[in-house]
């Protein structure tokens, strides 16, 4: 008989940051790791394998279970990934960019901030693709040394980038067609926004590649990397698969390199998975 190895292409492994929230179902009420399923669906529909990355802590004892270990835990998690999505959510703590909190700024969530900053640092260290959405884009800017406008509606000439409580606002954005995400979406796009904060001082090493009509920064990239993109809008809300697909494809290249390295190390061993042909 002739034995032929089975090779099954694997989906790029995409980590999605999540948050902790109080949820209830049936008779139960618990703090849970939460994330809108639209993120998961968009990653899966774009060919990726979504993996959730919740911040770890102990709500009952009121302390963080892994205090001081965020960097090492994030490095372990990111070592398993081909790409990272920093998802939307609550305001970033202004203390991270050395400013006092505005009256309109939401309460700090140090557990999530520390965890996602550690995930981002580990992803950049491994140079895997990063897609940062809304809060994620703001956190990315802060990680690069930038700051935020804490309440955009208070700025003269600025539009409200929300459509009302729990309602996304459709807004046109102008994009640089020669840079991400414009190379994927074109020179302009109508997007779904829901943010009251925005990027103020741009982080070192980042480039603005998209703006709203009022001048608000809506897209930024680290041009020194193959794919490190932040968008202020919510592509998952519209199931905007073009951006997710470009991201997952970039992550696929990381997976292919890793798979090739593993295969090279295993060339001396016969495959354990075989098909026998007469």
Predicted regions and their residues:
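Active-site-proximal beta-strand elements of phosphoester/diester hydrolases
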Residues: 228-233
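Conserved G/P- and acidic residue-centered "switch" motifs that form tight phosphate/ATP-binding loops
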Residues: 134
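N-terminal beta1-alpha1 cap of cysteine-dependent amidohydrolase-like domains
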Residues: 1-129, 142-144, 149, 153-182, ...
């Amino acid at each position: 008989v002739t034995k032929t190895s089975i090779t099954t292409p694997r989906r790029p492994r995409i980590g999605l940051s999540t948050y902790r929230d109080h949820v209830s179902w049936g008779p139960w009420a618990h703090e849970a790791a939460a994330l809108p399923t639209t993120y998961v669906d968009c990653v899966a529909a774009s060919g990726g394998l979504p993996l959730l990355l919740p911040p770890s802590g102990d709500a009952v004892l009121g302390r963080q279970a892994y205090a001081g270990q965020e960097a090492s835990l994030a490095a372990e998690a990111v070592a398993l990934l081909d790409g990272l999505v920093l998802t939307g959510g609550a305001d970033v703590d202004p203390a991270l960019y050395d400013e006092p909190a505005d009256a309109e700024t939401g309460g700090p969530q140090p557990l999530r901030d520390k965890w996602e900053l550690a995930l981002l640092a580990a992803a950049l260290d491994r140079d895997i693709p990063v897609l940062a959405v809304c809060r994620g884009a703001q956190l990315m800017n802060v990680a690069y040394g930038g700051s935020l406008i804490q309440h955009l509606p208070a700025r003269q000439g600025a539009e409200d980038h929300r459509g009302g409580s729990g309602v996304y606002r459709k807004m046109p954005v102008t994009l640089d067609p020669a840079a991400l995400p414009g190379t994927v979406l074109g020179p302009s796009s109508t997007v779904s926004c829901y943010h009251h904060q925005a990027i103020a001082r741009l982080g070192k090493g980042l480039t603005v590649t998209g703006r709203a009509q009022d001048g608000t920064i809506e897209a930024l990239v680290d041009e020194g990397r193959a794919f490190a993109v932040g968008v202020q809008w919510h592509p998952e809300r519209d199931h905007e698969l073009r951006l997710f697909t470009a991201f997952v494809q970039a992550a696929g290249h990381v997976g292919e390199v890793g798979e090739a390295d593993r295969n090279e190390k295993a060339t001396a061993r016969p495959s354990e998975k075989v098909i026998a042909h007469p």
